[in-house]
Amino acid sequence: MGPRGRQSPSATLAPSQGSCFFILFCLRLGASCPQACQCPDHAGAVAVHCSSRGLQEIPRDIPADTVLLKLDANRISRVPNGAFQHLPQLRELDLSHNAIEAIGPAAFSGLAGGLRLLDLSHNRIRRIPKDALGKLSAKIRLSHNPLHCECALQEALWELKLDPDSVDEIACHTSAQEQFVGKPLIQVLDSGASFCSTHRKTTDVAMLVTMFGWFTMVIAYVVYYVRHNQEDARRHLEYLKSLPSAPVSKEPLSPVP
C-alpha cells in the first residue's frame, strides 16, 4: 500500500482537466454568438437574432452552423459579395426593414441549395439584382421596395421564386409608363402589359435615329462632292475662256491638187 494521504496522478489531474474543459466550453459559447446579438436555442438549431441592434453592416462573426439569421430592423444599406458564404447550413435569412439599396452579384453565394426563405421586404431596392437572386431556390419577399418597373425587372421576376403570401404587395414605384405607377406588379403583368415591348420600341427608335443620321451624312457628302465638282468645272471653263484665241487667216484656201 502506498503512503496515507498520497493521491494518485489521475486524481490530481482530473479537476484540472475538468476546469480546462469548462473554460473551453465557455469560450465556445462566447464565440458562437456575435456581441450585439442573441442566440436562443431552437430545438438544437443555431438561431442568431440581431434584430433592432442599429447595425450598419452584416456581422462577420456569425457561427458557421447558423440555421436562422435575423438581421431585420437595422440600418444595413448594402449586402456585399460573399456576406454569407461561410454559412452553408443557413435556411432562413431575414433582412427586412433595413435601408438596403445595393446587393452584390455574389452576395448570396454558397446559399443556393440550402436557403429556404429570404426576406428583403421594406428596403430601398430599386432594381432586382438577377445575378444575386436568380440562382436561389428560396422563397423571396420583395414587397414594399421602391422598384422601378422596367424590362430588366420583368425578366428577373421570371427566374425568382416569389413568396406567394406577399407577391401582391410588390408594386411599381416608378416606371417609364406612368399608368402603371403605384399598381401591383403582378396585376400589371397579368393584364398583358409588358415593359419589354416598350424597351424594344425605344431601342428601335434609337436605331432609326442612328440610321437617319448616317443617311443624312451620306447625302450631305454627296451634295458637297457634286457642288465641289461643279465649282471646279466652272473655274476650268472660265480659265479656258481667258486664254487668247489664235487669229483666223482670211486668205482663201488653195484647192487641193
Curated annotation (Swiss-Prot):
SMART domains: LRR_TYP (SM00369), LRRNT (SM00013). The chain crosses the membrane at residues 205-225. LRR repeats lie at residues 65-86, 89-110, 114-135. Residues 145-198 form the LRRCT domain. The keyword Nucleus does not apply. Pfam families: LRR_1, LRR_8, LRRNT. Belongs to the LRRC3 family. It comes from the Eukaryota. The keyword Transmembrane helix applies. Keywords: Leucine-rich repeat, Membrane, Repeat, Signal, Transmembrane, Transmembrane helix. It is a single-pass membrane protein. It is found in: Membrane. This is Leucine-rich repeat-containing protein 3. InterPro entries: Leu-rich_rpt, Leu-rich_rpt_typical-subtyp, LRR_dom_sf, LRR_TM_domain-containing, LRRNT. One of its GO terms (cellular component) is membrane. Its main location: membrane. It comes from Mus musculus (Mouse). The lineage of its organism: Eukaryota, Metazoa, Chordata, Craniata, Vertebrata. Gene3D superfamilies: Ribonuclease Inhibitor (3.80.10.10). Residues 1-32 form the signal peptide. Residues 33-64 form the LRRNT domain.
